[in-house]
Amino acid sequence: TRSGSVDPFIVDYLGKKRGMTVDETLYYLNKKCGFIGYCGYSDCRDIYRLIDEGDEKARLAMDVFGYQIRKIIGAYAAAMNGLDAIVFTGGIGENSADARNDICPGLEFLGAEFDAEASHDAPAARLRK
């Protein structure tokens, strides 16, 4: 539901353009953006169900999500002069093989090898080198 990384001046912009208070803007950014803003749902299970049904907005939500996560992983890899492992935590990271399958392809340039079968079958799936 959260907005992700946004320019901090969005608070001022929404206040002036939409007449929103700071509290309204913070509520909007934290409860009405992110997955909900793209497809109307915040739960990954619902979003992947919609994707299976052919919903383009749900597919876009997860494509953007995967892209943003890959950007963060790349930035961390650069800041730390490489990576030893990529570890998925939290509700989506630990419980959604679909999300891991959307995120990991494209990270091979880091030397990572993703095992989609292990990701699907194992509760603590791994991306290993």
Features from the language model and the residues they span:
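Short gly/pro-enriched beta-turn/loop segments at secondary-structure junctions
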Residues: 6, 42, 81-83
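Buried hydrophobic packing segments
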Residues: 10-14, 47, 73, 103
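A mobile "lid/hinge" subdomain adjacent to the ATP/sugar-phosphate binding pocket shared
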Residues: 18-61
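Glycine-rich phosphate-binding loop of actin/hexokinase-like ATP-binding domains
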Residues: 1-16
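Internal helix-turn-beta structural module
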Residues: 59-83, 93-129
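Glycine-rich beta-alpha junction loops
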Residues: 5, 32-33, 92
